[in-house]
Curated annotation (Swiss-Prot):
Assembly: F-type ATPases have 2 components, CF(1) - the catalytic core - and CF(0) - the membrane proton channel. CF(1) has five subunits: alpha(3), beta(3), gamma(1), delta(1), epsilon(1). CF(0) has three main subunits: a, b and c.
Primary location: mitochondrion
Pfam families cross-referenced by the UniProt entry: ATP-synt_DE_N (PF02823)
UniProt keywords, alphabetically: ATP synthesis, CF(1), Hydrogen ion transport, Ion transport, Membrane, Mitochondrion, Mitochondrion inner membrane, Transit peptide, Transport
Lineage, opening ranks: Eukaryota, Viridiplantae, Streptophyta, Embryophyta, Tracheophyta
PANTHER family: ATP SYNTHASE DELTA/EPSILON CHAIN, ATP SYNTHASE SUBUNIT DELTA', MITOCHONDRIAL
SUPFAM superfamilies (alphabetical): Epsilon subunit of F1F0-ATP synthase N-terminal domain
Subcellular location(s) of the protein: Mitochondrion; Mitochondrion inner membrane
UniProt name for this protein: ATP synthase subunit delta', mitochondrial
A Gene Ontology cellular-component term: mitochondrion
Length: 203
């Protein structure tokens, strides 16, 4: 009797599992009717409010990789408070990656690079524009577009060398007299940043 009950139970579980599991093709794309269905349902509940945007409203197709290497590199250089360069076509950009100076030309392999304090130079013909970057990231895409995001950046020709020397001396003094780990860390950051600026100006 126990064996018969076990067989009946296993059959019922298998039948329930086969009914609950439906096969369908895996897809990361949203159904085309999803947005319209959501909007209609939203209007029934809150007719006086605009419906929020669904994830598909922010989705864009991935840019296609060109069949030939472009002659120019398109650069977008963005800071938290402004866009320094937007869709700027240049010949080359040299960025201060955490692994060392990185030259970026049209057709560069797709890369994400962390930026350290240092000089970024933008080359357009014989014109070279240099910026001091505090930190950030560079996103290099297969379609020869470079998105460079920096926490802070200053054109190199806007920096006063005497103020850099003064700041370096102040932070070196703070580092020597620091008594807590926090004071040491803050002073060390100041020394490293001012040293990088000083090296860029003297180089």
């Amino acid at each position: 009797m126990f064996k018969q009950a076990s067989r009946l139970l296993s059959r019922s579980v298998a039948a329930a599992s086969s009914k609950s599991v439906t096969t369908r093709a895996f897809s990361t794309e949203l159904p085309s009717t999803l947005d319209s269905t959501f909007v209609e349902a939203w209007k029934k509940v809150a007719p006086n409010m605009d419906p929020p945007q669904t994830p598909s409203a922010f989705m864009k197709p991935r840019p296609s990789t060109p069949s030939s290497i472009p002659t120019k590199l398109t650069v977008n250089f963005v800071l938290p408070y402004t866009s320094e360069l937007t869709g700027k076509e240049v010949d080359m950009v040299i960025i201060p990656a955490s692994t060392g100076q990185m030259g970026v030309l049209p057709g560069h392999v797709p890369t994400i690079a962390e930026l350290k304090p240092g000089i970024m130079s933008v080359h357009e013909g014989t014109d070279v524009k240099k910026y001091f970057l505090s930190s950030g990231f560079a996103f290099l895409h297969a379609n020869s577009v470079a998105d460079i995001i920096a926490v802070e950046a200053v054109p190199l020709d806007h920096i006063d060398p005497s103020q850099v020397q003064k700041g370096l001396a102040e932070f070196q003094q703070k580092l020597a007299s620091a008594t807590t780990d926090l004071e040491k860390a803050e002073a060390q950051i100041g020394v490293e940043v001012h040293s990088a600026i000083n090296a860029a100006l003297s180089g």
